[in-house]
C-alpha cells in the first residue's frame, strides 16, 4: 500500500450561537471566533482512503506521497496525515486503530466538557447543559476578569453529587501563597475535583508548596516541565497532553507509568470528530489515559456522520476498522474555505 494523493482542506466551523458572543469577549476578536483547522484526505494505490485532521502542513504533504502509511504512525511531524495513516493501516488490516497501539484495555472513555471563562450565569447554563448531555466532568478556564468562586457557586447550585469540576487557571493564580487563598475558598465546594496549572509551570518549589498544603489533585502539561522532572519532583497527580499526536504521548505515558503510574488527560483531538475519534482509540489501548477533552462538542458541526454520544460521563470507542468514523462530505463542502 502506497500513498498516492493527499488533499489538505482548510475549514472553518462556528461555535454554537449561544457561545459566540462570549467566546468573542474572552478571545478579544473583532468577530465571533471559529474553529479553524485542516481536513486531510489521504488516498492509496489499493483503493483505501484515510481521514485526518490537524494544523496546516502546506506543501509538506508532498513528502508523504509514494510512501507506506505505516512509516508515519510514530512520526508526530505528520500531524493530521499521521491520523489518516492510522485510519488507513487499520482499514487495511481490518482492525480498529487502537490495535496499532496494543491490546485494548477499555471500551469506553471518561469525557470532560470544556468552557472558557464566562460570566457566572453563562457558566451555570453550560454546566446544566453539559450534565444533560451526559458529561460528569467539566473543565472551567479560570481568568482574572471573573471570580472563580462566583463561577463555581453558580455552576454547582443544585447539581448532582457526581458532577465534578476541574479549575484551569493556566498559571494565572500568581504566586503560591496567592493561589492558596483562592484554593482555600474553592475547598468549600465539594464538586470541585482538581486543579490544572494553578500557578506558572516554572515554579517548581511553588508546586511542592501547594502539594503539601492542599488536597486537590493537580494536573500539569506534559512538556512544561518534562514528565520526568514532574515525576521526580512530585509536582503533580495528573498530566495533560495537548497536540502530541502519537510518539510523544506514548513516550510520556510510559515515563509516567514508571513513576507511580500517573494518569493523563488527553486533548490532542480538540477540533473535529475525526481527531476526537483518534484520541478515543489512543485511550482504548494506553492504560494510563484517564480522560479526554474535545471542543468539537461546542461546534455547529463535528464533520463526521456517526453521532458521538456521552452517557453517564463516558463515550464508547468506535468499533469499526481504522478510526471507525466517516467524514461528512456535505459538511466538508459547506465548511471549506479558500
Residue ranges and their predicted role:
Residues 109-115, 138-140, 165-169, 195-196, ...:
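Hydrophobic faces of well-ordered beta-strands that scaffold small-molecule active sites
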Residues 118-120, 143-148, 169-178, 194-204, ...:
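Short, small-residue-enriched loops and turns at beta-alpha junctions
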Residues 21-23, 67, 73, 184, ...:
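Shared catalytic-loop signature of beta/alpha-barrel
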Residues 7, 51, 199-200, 283:
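Generic short alpha-helical hydrophobic face used as a protein-protein interaction/packing hotspot
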Amino acid at each position: 500500500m502506497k500513498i498516492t494523493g493527499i488533499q489538505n482542506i482548510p475549514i472553518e466551523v462556528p461555535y454554537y450561537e449561544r457561545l459566540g458572543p462570549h467566546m468573542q469577549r474572552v478571545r478579544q476578536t473583532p468577530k465571533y471566533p471559529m474553529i479553524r483547522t485542516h481536513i486531510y484526505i489521504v488516498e492509496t494505490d489499493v483503493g483505501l482512503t484515510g481521514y485526518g485532521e490537524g494544523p496546516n502542513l502546506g506543501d509538506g504533504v508532498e513528502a508523504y506521497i509514494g510512501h507506506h502509511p505505516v512509516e508515519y504512525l510514530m512520526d508526530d511531524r505528520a500531524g493530521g496525515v499521521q491520523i489518516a495513516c492510522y485510519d488507513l493501516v487499520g482499514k487495511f488490516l481490518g482492525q480498529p486503530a487502537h490495535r496499532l497501539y496494543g491490546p485494548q484495555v477499555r471500551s469506553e472513555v471518561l469525557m470532560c466538557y470544556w468552557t472558557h471563562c464566562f460570566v457566572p450565569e453563562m457558566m451555570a447554563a453550560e454546566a446544566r447543559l453539559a450534565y444533560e448531555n451526559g458529561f460528569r466532568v467539566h473543565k472551567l478556564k479560570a481568568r482574572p476578569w471573573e471570580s472563580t468562586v462566583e463561577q463555581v457557586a453558580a455552576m454547582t447550585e443544585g447539581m448532582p453529587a457526581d458532577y465534578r469540576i476541574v479549575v484551569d487557571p493556566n498559571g494565572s493564580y500568581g504566586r503560591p501563597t496567592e493561589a492558596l487563598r483562592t484554593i482555600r475558598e474553592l475547598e468549600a465546594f465539594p464538586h470541585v475535583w482538581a486543579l490544572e496549572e494553578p500557578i506558572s509551570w516554572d515554579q517548581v518549589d511553588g508546586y511542592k508548596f501547594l502539594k503539601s498544603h492542599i488536597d486537590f489533585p493537580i494536573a500539569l502539561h506534559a512538556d512544561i516541565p518534562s514528565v520526568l522532572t514532574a515525576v521526580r519532583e512530585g509536582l503533580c497527580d495528573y498530566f495533560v497532553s495537548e497536540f502530541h499526536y502519537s510518539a510523544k504521548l506514548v513516550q510520556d505515558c510510559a515515563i509516567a507509568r514508571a513513576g507511580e503510574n500517573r494518569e493523563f488527560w488527553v486533548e490532542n483531538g480538540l477540533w473535529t470528530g475525526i481527531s476526537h475519534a483518534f484520541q478515543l482509540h489512543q485511550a482504548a489501548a494506553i492504560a494510563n489515559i484517564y480522560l479526554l477533552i474535545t471542543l468539537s462538542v461546542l461546534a455547529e458541526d463535528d464533520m463526521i456522520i456517526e453521532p458521538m454520544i456521552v452517557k453517564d460521563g463516558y463515550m464508547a470507542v468506535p468499533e469499526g476498522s481504522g478510526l471507525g468514523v466517516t467524514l461528512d462530505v456535505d459538511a466538508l463542502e459547506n465548511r471549506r474555505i479558500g
